[in-house]
Amino acid sequence: METMKSKANCAQNPNCNIMIFHPTKEEFNDFDKYIAYMESQGAHRAGLAKIIPPKEWKARETYDNISEILIATPLQQVASGRAGVFTQYHKKKKAMTVGEYRHLANSKKYQTPPHQNFEDLERKYWKNRIYNSPIYGADISGSLFDENTKQWNLGHLGTIQDLLEKECGVVIEGVNTPYLYFGMWKTTFAWHTEDMDLYSINYLHLGEPKTWYVVPPEHGQRLERLARELFPGSSRGCGAFLRHKVALISPTVLKENGIPFNRITQEAGEFMVTFPYGYHAGFNHGFNCAEAINFATPRWIDYGKMASQCSCGEARVTFSMDAFVRILQPERYDLWKRGQDRAVVDHMEPRVPASQELSTQKEVQLPRRAALGLRQLPSHWARHSPWPMAARSGTRCHTLVCSSLPRRSAVSGTATQPRAAAVHSSKKPSSTPSSTPGPSAQIIHPSNGRRGRGRPPQKLRAQELTLQTPAKRPLLAGTTCTASGPEPEPLPEDGALMDKPVPLSPGLQHPVKASGCSWAPVP
């Protein structure tokens, strides 16, 4: 029976489509349980999923009082390259407030160009990426969630990642405390997986949309092989150079080299969750504010034990897996300590059986969390550190207990020094823009008692991805900025763009279509 259940689980979402979930108010109460439910439906196979909160929920009463938050080190993202293959690095700019940044983002020089739809804007992005470098207000430590927001508050998700601080006394900003990102048109994040191949969650608080691209985890190694061929100098210098977050590869190049991927656009008021070893990239459509943090589940532990590490020191963020294995995999702890744990990660296997109802998981999840001493943690790190404001003197920074692990930079992949804080509000509610599903997404409405107990989730069939001959309209991939420091290795001369495709990568020209995964079309 268990074998049959396992096979049924693997059959969920065989095309690796990005799935969209609409939890009810009740289903939204337990974050850990809902992530398990999403995986039981196969959401993890895409590497990325969208969650649209219930209409009764809100992250924050008002955003009217955030203009004086200080962006201490805005970063100008400079890209070089051609034919859909770029590198990106940062130039530090002078500090500015969020209000000043918003004004800059909406100025004639940096504003979003006129466009007919998202696809038209994507074409403009890739055609003009190397010109007029945008400025990103990234890696700002803090949260915009109100303290009284109990569900899906990124300041205290209460997942097993809390063991990192509880058992090891380690706090890494951006990993187990939230980061804020203030974006403008063309600000980007390059192809990467999360540090230690953790999960991540991103909430778009306000502003213009964010487009995401993702390669299914079961095809991540194919992207790595292609990146090594396209960036041979970086590959020779570091075995895990994609962790530097400098490599920009367009969807056209991915398609020409047979790399399966998907695309979706996130709008204000929506969550995106990335799954372990899901390579992702993307760009912002205009001024916006997002918040992100990593988290973990029991399914991640084997990923963490096998995660690649930056070997050159440019972007090394790591921590011991000891507490996670000792507490959550006690039967394998001794083998793991001796280096004899031969577990193999199964990218297709979900965390819980697909037949297990969402409503019956509470008695399984809660006792386990209680046994570990996990709870909905208050944002103690936030309360001790007020926001850095432009006119405020004597701003305090919360002391991080990281031993030799400095703060990681989510944008550049480098380790940097700690920064500060969090803010809360209490005014009128803000409106949440309506959302529109992406072209390759499944809509998931989990069943509940009111709509018919035990009824399987409603699914709107996704547009199937095929290995068609490229059409005229390009499908795009996103990018991020690299850290300040040495400039990227030389690429083909600047100026040529996606209309001149790069040669196909040897050995990847005629890939065998893997079981159950989709192939991204150029619409």
Curated annotation (Swiss-Prot):
<feature type="binding site">
    <location>
        <position position="310"/>
    </location>
    <ligand>
        <name>Zn(2+)</name>
    </ligand>
</feature>
<dbReference type="GO" id="GO:0035861">
    <property type="term" value="C:site of double-strand break"/>
</dbReference>
<dbReference type="GO" id="GO:0046872">
    <property type="term" value="F:metal ion binding"/>
</dbReference>
<comment type="similarity">
    <text>Belongs to the JHDM3 histone demethylase family.</text>
</comment>
<dbReference type="InterPro" id="IPR003347">
    <property type="entry name" value="JmjC_dom"/>
</dbReference>
<dbReference type="InterPro" id="IPR003349">
    <property type="entry name" value="JmjN"/>
</dbReference>
<dbReference type="GO" id="GO:0005634">
    <property type="term" value="C:nucleus"/>
</dbReference>
<keyword id="KW-0832">Ubl conjugation</keyword>
<keyword id="KW-0804">Transcription</keyword>
<dbReference type="Pfam" id="PF02375">
    <property type="entry name" value="JmjN"/>
</dbReference>
<dbReference type="GO" id="GO:2001034">
    <property type="term" value="P:positive regulation of double-strand break repair via nonhomologous end joining"/>
</dbReference>
<dbReference type="GO" id="GO:0035563">
    <property type="term" value="P:positive regulation of chromatin binding"/>
</dbReference>
<dbReference type="GO" id="GO:0003684">
    <property type="term" value="F:damaged DNA binding"/>
</dbReference>
<dbReference type="GO" id="GO:0006338">
    <property type="term" value="P:chromatin remodeling"/>
</dbReference>
<feature type="binding site">
    <location>
        <position position="245"/>
    </location>
    <ligand>
        <name>2-oxoglutarate</name>
    </ligand>
</feature>
<keyword id="KW-0805">Transcription regulation</keyword>
<dbReference type="Pfam" id="PF02373">
    <property type="entry name" value="JmjC"/>
</dbReference>
<dbReference type="GO" id="GO:0071479">
    <property type="term" value="P:cellular response to ionizing radiation"/>
</dbReference>
<feature type="region of interest" description="Disordered">
    <location>
        <begin position="407"/>
        <end position="523"/>
    </location>
</feature>
<feature type="compositionally biased region" description="Low complexity">
    <location>
        <begin position="428"/>
        <end position="440"/>
    </location>
</feature>
<feature type="binding site">
    <location>
        <position position="312"/>
    </location>
    <ligand>
        <name>Zn(2+)</name>
    </ligand>
</feature>
<feature type="compositionally biased region" description="Basic residues">
    <location>
        <begin position="448"/>
        <end position="458"/>
    </location>
</feature>
<feature type="binding site">
    <location>
        <position position="238"/>
    </location>
    <ligand>
        <name>Zn(2+)</name>
    </ligand>
</feature>
<keyword id="KW-0408">Iron</keyword>
<comment type="function">
    <text>Histone demethylase that specifically demethylates 'Lys-9' of histone H3, thereby playing a central role in histone code. Does not demethylate histone H3 'Lys-4', H3 'Lys-27', H3 'Lys-36' nor H4 'Lys-20'. Demethylates both di- and trimethylated H3 'Lys-9' residue, while it has no activity on monomethylated residues. Demethylation of Lys residue generates formaldehyde and succinate.</text>
</comment>
<keyword id="KW-0156">Chromatin regulator</keyword>
<feature type="binding site">
    <location>
        <position position="136"/>
    </location>
    <ligand>
        <name>2-oxoglutarate</name>
    </ligand>
</feature>
<protein>
    <recommendedName>
        <fullName>Lysine-specific demethylase 4D</fullName>
        <ecNumber>1.14.11.66</ecNumber>
    </recommendedName>
</protein>
<dbReference type="GO" id="GO:0140684">
    <property type="term" value="F:histone H3K9me2/H3K9me3 demethylase activity"/>
</dbReference>
<feature type="domain" description="JmjC">
    <location>
        <begin position="146"/>
        <end position="312"/>
    </location>
</feature>
<dbReference type="GO" id="GO:0032452">
    <property type="term" value="F:histone demethylase activity"/>
</dbReference>
<dbReference type="GO" id="GO:0032454">
    <property type="term" value="F:histone H3K9 demethylase activity"/>
</dbReference>
<feature type="modified residue" description="PolyADP-ribosyl glutamic acid">
    <location>
        <position position="27"/>
    </location>
</feature>
<feature type="binding site">
    <location>
        <position position="210"/>
    </location>
    <ligand>
        <name>2-oxoglutarate</name>
    </ligand>
</feature>
<dbReference type="GO" id="GO:0031490">
    <property type="term" value="F:chromatin DNA binding"/>
</dbReference>
<feature type="domain" description="JmjN">
    <location>
        <begin position="18"/>
        <end position="60"/>
    </location>
</feature>
<feature type="binding site">
    <location>
        <position position="194"/>
    </location>
    <ligand>
        <name>Fe cation</name>
    </ligand>
</feature>
<keyword id="KW-0479">Metal-binding</keyword>
<dbReference type="GO" id="GO:0001932">
    <property type="term" value="P:regulation of protein phosphorylation"/>
</dbReference>
<keyword id="KW-0013">ADP-ribosylation</keyword>
<dbReference type="GO" id="GO:0005721">
    <property type="term" value="C:pericentric heterochromatin"/>
</dbReference>
<feature type="binding site">
    <location>
        <position position="202"/>
    </location>
    <ligand>
        <name>2-oxoglutarate</name>
    </ligand>
</feature>
